[in-house]
Amino acid sequence: MQVKDQLSLLQPYKPGKSPEQMKEVYGDHSFVKLASNENSFGCSPRVLDELQKSWLDHALYPDGGATTLRQTIANKLHVQMEQVLCGSGLDEVIQIISRAVLKAGDNIVTAGATFPQYRHHAIIEGCEVKEVALNNGVYDLDEISSVVDNNTKIVWICNPNNPTGTYVNDRKLTQFIEGISENTLIVIDEAYYEYVTAKDFPETLPLLEKHKNILVLRTFSKAYGLASFRVGYAVGHEELIEKLNVVRLPFNVSSLAQKAATIAFGDDEFIEEIVRVNTEGLRQYESFCKENEIPFYQSQTNFIFLPVENGGEIYEACAHAGFIIRPFPNGVRITVGTREQNEGVISVLQQHFENKKRKSRDEANV
């Protein structure tokens, strides 16, 4: 069967292993999943309460336009409903954007170490992918600007960045946007927006009034704790959103997902508490790393990245202790959990790095 030639360059997305899959390899004991940046504390209790009380006619299609959810988002963000596009997670929103905008001969520009779906969908559409190395874990907007050309249709900026957790500040982002042609779409993926505590983090929505070529992406999968419902959204200029809706599949967000997201979006107290406990969890890891001279990136998300060698060894050590983290060629990414879970992972890290120091000393004395 003939398919696009470029599909041979790609692999299906491989999520982190589930606890059930881990048991097959590491034995039948409990596992804590800290690999995919889900909310370790779950979702708003209001969501669970309201869904139990609600009745949905499961024989009927959902509202194809997600009208109530989009209006709820628009009201809170002070934009028009027509500026909001909802998708089955940001994965689908990224696919919609790529399918609507890109064609063979175009290129996209993004970072070399960032969310891989930007690259994935560009290749599917037959586009060149220009990847710029991070600068100390942060998007290098100066370098990105220098490689943008007349064929660049999309610049993808993950802010805060996944997997490093770092961010581009307001001044740098605004300066970058001012220097990019309005013919190039700038997509700012703010999946971890709710976790941010930095004072100079950009407020991007006001930029939409001046720049028609900006799209801001956010999700209910992270801080809102609704990853299994698959709801993400884009906010942009009304004319652009209208065109993207042509590509969007009909009935792409289920009735249950729309209702859960609408309820969750109204519980500000829950988000405030989540940010508080998440910040405490980050401080646990940061304190440990500083005390033991272990490199880490200052995070504005619900995970921390340690740029260290032998990430696979750390993954194995954590797995044998019942913790699932995400290894990378140049480090490990660890989702913030409960205080007790963080302490458990830190204990494994402590033992791992002590063993490495001991081994280095022994080799030096040989």
UniProtKB/Swiss-Prot annotation:
SUPFAM superfamilies, per database record: PLP-dependent transferases
Q: Region Disordered: what ranges?
A: 1-21
Q: Could you tell me the superkingdom of the organism this chain comes from? A: Bacteria
Its cofactor is:
pyridoxal 5'-phosphate
Q: Which UniProt keywords apply?
A: Amino-acid biosynthesis, Aminotransferase, Histidine biosynthesis, Pyridoxal phosphate, Transferase
InterPro entries named among the record's database cross-references: Aminotrans_II_pyridoxalP_BS, Aminotransferase_I/II_large, HisP_aminotrans, HistidinolP_aminotransfase, PyrdxlP-dep_Trfase, PyrdxlP-dep_Trfase_major, PyrdxlP-dep_Trfase_small
Name its GO BP terms in alphabetical order: L-histidine biosynthetic process
What is this enzyme's catalytic activity, as reactions? L-histidinol phosphate + 2-oxoglutarate = 3-(imidazol-4-yl)-2-oxopropyl phosphate + L-glutamate
| UniProt GO molecular function | histidinol-phosphate transaminase activity; pyridoxal phosphate binding
Output the Gene3D superfamilies linked to this UniProt entry.
Aspartate Aminotransferase, domain 1, Type I PLP-dependent aspartate aminotransferase-like (Major domain)
Checking Pfam families in the record gives:
Aminotran_1_2
Q: What is this protein's name?
A: Histidinol-phosphate aminotransferase 2
What species is this protein from?
A: Bacillus cereus (strain ZK / E33L)
Q: Which gene encodes it?
A: hisC2
